[in-house]
Amino acid sequence: MFCLALRCGCACPWYGERDRLGGLLADRSGLSVQLPVDARRDVVIPPDVDLSDGLSQAEAVRLGMQNNAQFHVLLTDLETFQAAVIEADQVANPQLMTLFPLGVKQWELALRLPIDALWLRSLRVSAANLQSRRVTERLVQDGLNVVRDIRVAYINHAAAQQQLEVARQGAKLRQAIAAVAEARWRAGAISELDASAMRLDALASGQEIVERQGQVSLTRDRLRTAMGTISLAESFDQLQSSTATPPDQLELSTLVEVALAQRPDLGAIQIGVFAAQQVSELSRHNYLTVLGILPDLNGRGLKGLEAGPGLQLNLPIFHQNQGAIARANASWLLAERQLVAARDSVRLEVGQAYTQLQQAQQALTFWQGKMVPVAEKSVGSARRALQEDAVSLLIVLEATRQLQNARQRKVAAWANVQRSIAELERSIGGKLDSLPGKNSDTDVQEYRHERSQSIPNPAGH
C-alpha cells in the first residue's frame, strides 16, 4: 500500500492544453497561429510575415495573435488551470507522529498515509482536467474574438484610406470647377455670388481631406493596438488589397446548425456541465477522510517492540456533507441552464450577423452597380455641357458632389460587407468556406458529428 501511494503521489500529470489551443485556433481561423510562450517584452514578428510588400489581413492576424496584450492576459488562465490540475493530482504527504520515551511514557511512532486518495484522486483529477479543457475552449472563442477585432481594425483602416482617396479625387474636381467659375467671373459671365459659392465649396473639399487624414490616423492606431505593435515605428499604411467573398446562397439554418455544433464557447459550457457533474459526484465522497496508520510502533509492549496497522477516519454522524452536495448540485443545474441560454444567444448572434451581411451586400450592389456608374456618367455629361457653356456651374457642382457621395457610400458598403463577414465567421466559430453542403441535411448532420468529436471525453484526462 505504501508503494502504491508513493507511486500515485509522485506521478506528474501530462498537460498539453497550450498545444491544443494553438491547433484549434489554426483550424477555426484558417491561419497558422503561433501562441506566445512567455511574457511578451518586445514585439515579435512571425517568420511568415513579410512587411516589405505591404501588410495583408492574414499577416495582421498573425501579428496580433503573437503580440496582442489583452489576449496574453487571457492566456494566463492556461497556467492557472495547469496548476489546478497538478494540485488535484497531488496526494497529501504522509504524516509521521512520534512520542518520546520520557518518564513512564513508552516510545511510540505512527506513519499515517492518506489512503482515501486512492479512490478520490481520480475524481479530483477528472474534475480539474475538465475545468482546464473548458478554459481551453473558452480561450479558443476569445482568440476568435481577437481575430475578428484585428480583421475589423484592418478593414476600417483600409476603408479610411479609400475614403481619403475619394476625398482627394472629389477635391480635384471641385477645385477645377472653382477655377472655371473664377475665370468666368473675371470675364463677367457669372455673378460674384456664384463665384463665391464655388470658392467656398473648394475650401470645404480641402477641409474634408484634412478630416479624412485624421480618420486614417485614428484607424491606423487602432489597428496597431489590435496587433500589439503600437510601440513600433512602423505605420502600416501600405496595405495589400484584400476582399473576402462569402459563399453563394448562404442558408441561415445551416449557419445556425454549424454554430451550435462548433462554437468553442458552447463547447466550454458543455464541458462545464460535465465538470459540475464530476464535482457533484466528488462531493458525495469527499467528506470521508481515511488515514491508514502503517505502522504503529510501541517501544515496550508485552513482547518488547510491537508494530501493527490501523485506521484513523472521521465518523459521519452529525452531517454527511449535505451542504457541499447541495451547492455542487446547484452549480450543475446552473451550468445546464447556462448552456440553454448560450444556445439561444448563438442563434441570435448568427441571425443578426447573417441579416447584416445580406443588407450590406444589397447596399454594395446598389452603390457599386447602379449609383456610381450613373453618377460618373452624369458628371461627364455636365462637364461636357460646361465646356459648351450650356449648363449652370451649380448643376455641375451638384453632380460632382453626388459622385463623391456615391463613391464614399460604395466604400462604406464594401467595408460593411467585410466587417459582416468577419462577424459572421466569429458567430459560427469558423470559416465560411468550411461549411458543409448548403442543401444537404445529411452533410450538416455529419458535420455536427465531426465537430462534436473535438469536445474532450469527460472521463479522460
Annotated model-derived regions:
Residues 44-53, 85, 91-127, 238-251, ...:
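Small/polar, glycine/serine/threonine/aspartate-rich low-complexity segments that form flexible
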Residues 66-73, 79-94, 109-127, 137-144, ...:
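A glycine-/polar-enriched beta->alpha junction
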Residues 75, 126-129, 192-200, 393-401:
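Short, charged, amphipathic alpha-helical segments
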Residues 137-258, 356, 360, 364, ...:
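Periplasmic alpha-helical coiled-coil/stalk elements that build and connect Gram-negative outer-membrane
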Residues 191, 346, 353, 389-393:
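Alpha-helical heptad-repeat coiled-coil segments that mediate oligomerization/polymerization in large
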Residues 204-234, 338, 360, 374-430, ...:
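Short segments within alpha-helical structural elements
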